[in-house]
UniProtKB/Swiss-Prot annotation:
It comes from Drosophila virilis (Fruit fly). Belongs to the phosphoglycerate mutase family. BPG-dependent PGAM subfamily. It catalyses: O-phospho-L-seryl-[protein] + H2O = L-seryl-[protein] + phosphate; O-phospho-L-threonyl-[protein] + H2O = L-threonyl-[protein] + phosphate. One of its GO terms (biological process) is response to heat. The chain crosses the membrane at residues 7-23. It is a single-pass membrane protein. It holds the Pfam family His_Phos_1. GO terms for molecular function: kinase binding; phosphoprotein phosphatase activity; protein serine/threonine kinase activator activity; protein serine/threonine phosphatase activity. Interacts with Pk92B/ASK1. GO terms for cellular component: mitochondrial outer membrane. This is Serine/threonine-protein phosphatase Pgam5, mitochondrial. Keywords: Hydrolase, Membrane, Mitochondrion, Mitochondrion outer membrane, Transmembrane, Transmembrane helix. It is found in: Mitochondrion outer membrane.
C-alpha cells in the first residue's frame, strides 16, 4: 500500500510539473491580444534610440568614476548635445507624368499632374507652415512639381535646393518580391547606397542649437518616399513596396528631440477631387511600374 501511495504521489507530482511547464511554454500561451505579451513579438519591435547616431550619450566621453567633478563634467557635456526642438519633414511625391522617351528630360508632368501639384501647394498654404527648407529631386517631374507648389506657398523660389540623391531608383529588393518589377542586382547596389545616403542626410534629430521646431519640405519620388518611411519608423526596409502613395501626396514625419519618430500623414490626397487621384503612370505611357 505504501509503495502504491508513493507511486501515485510521484506520478501526480510529475504530471503537475509537466502541466505547469506546458503552461509556461510561450508557444502555447494565449493572450487576448499580442500587446498583452510581456516581451516584444519580434526583434523588429525594439526601438533603436541611437538610430541617427545623435543620442547625446553616444557623443560624449563616458563617465570615468563617481567623483563629483567627473559627474559634473559628464552632465555638462551631455547637456551640450541634447536636442531641444522637433523636426518636421514633409515629403511630396511628384505629380502624374508621361514616361516618354529614354531621357529624363522628356518626362514632363501631364496636365492632370500639374493640377495635382497645384492642389497640393494650396493644401500646404492652408496649413500655414513657415518653411525652413525646400528641397527637390533634380529629376524633371520633381522639379516641375516643386515649381508649381512654390507658386502657392510662402517661400522664396531662389532658395530651392536641388538634390541628386533624391532621384528615383530601386532602394532595396522588396519583400515579397513582385513579378512585374525586377531591376538588376547592380541597380539595387547603385541606387540603394544613394537613397540610403539621402535618408541619412535629411533624417536626424535637431541640432542642439536649434531653438524652435523646423519644417523641411522635400519633393521626390514614390520609391524613395516609401523607403524613407520604413527606415524612419524602423520598419523592415524591404517592406517599402507594400505601401502605395498617390501622385502629389503628402507624407509627414516628425522627429522629436529624443529621437523618437512619428508619422502624421502617409500619402494624404484627401484634399484633391477624386477624379484627380492617380498613383501609376498613365496607361498610354510605356514602362508602367
Amino acid at each position: 500500500m505504501r509503495k502504491f501511495t508513493a507511486f501515485a504521489c510521484g506520478t501526480g507530482a510529475g504530471l503537475a510539473a509537466y502541466y505547469l511547464q506546458k503552461l509556461r511554454d510561450p508557444q502555447l500561451a494565449v493572450h487576448n491580444s499580442w500587446t498583452n505579451s510581456d516581451r516584444p513579438i519580434s526583434e523588429c519591435a525594439l526601438w533603436d534610440s541611437n538610430w541617427d547616431f545623435r543620442d547625446p550619450k553616444s557623443l560624449v566621453r563616458p563617465q570615468k568614476n563617481d567623483l563629483p567633478q567627473e559627474q559634473n563634467r559628464y552632465n555638462s557635456d551631455l547637456e551640450k548635445h541634447v536636442a531641444k526642438s522637433a523636426r518636421h519633414i514633409i515629403l511630396i511625391r511628384h505629380g502624374e507624368y508621361l514616361d516618354v522617351g529614354d531621357s529624363d528630360d522628356t518626362h514632363h508632368l501631364t496636365d492632370r499632374g500639374r493640377l495635382q501639384a497645384k492642389y497640393t501647394g494650396q493644401r500646404l498654404r492652408e496649413l500655414g507652415i513657415k518653411w525652413d527648407k525646400v528641397i527637390a529631386s533634380n529629376m524633371v517631374r520633381a522639379q516641375e512639381t516643386a515649381d508649381i507648389i512654390l507658386n502657392q506657398i510662402d517661400y522664396d523660389k531662389a532658395k530651392l535646393k536641388h538634390c541628386s540623391y533624391l532621384r528615383e531608383g530601386a532602394p532595396i529588393p522588396p519583400q515579397p518580391p513582385v513579378g512585374h518589377w525586377k531591376p538588376e542586382a547592380s541597380q539595387f547596389f547603385r541606387d540603394g547606397a544613394r537613397i540610403e545616403a539621402a535618408f541619412r542626410r535629411y533624417f536626424h534629430r535637431a541640432l542642439p542649437e536649434q531653438e524652435k521646431e523646423s519644417y523641411t519640405l522635400i519633393v521626390g519620388h514614390g520609391n524613395v518616399i516609401r523607403y524613407f518611411v520604413c527606415r524612419a519608423l524602423q520598419f523592415p526596409a524591404e517592406a517599402w513596396l507594400r505601401i502605395s502613395i498617390n501622385h502629389a501626396s503628402i507624407t509627414w514625419l516628425t522627429i522629436s528631440p529624443s529621437g523618437n519618430v512619428s508619422i502624421k500623414y502617409l500619402g494624404d490626397t484627401g484634399f484633391m477631387p477624386a477624379k484627380y487621384l492617380t498613383h501609376r503612370i498613365p496607361r498610354d505611357a510605356k514602362n508602367v511600374v
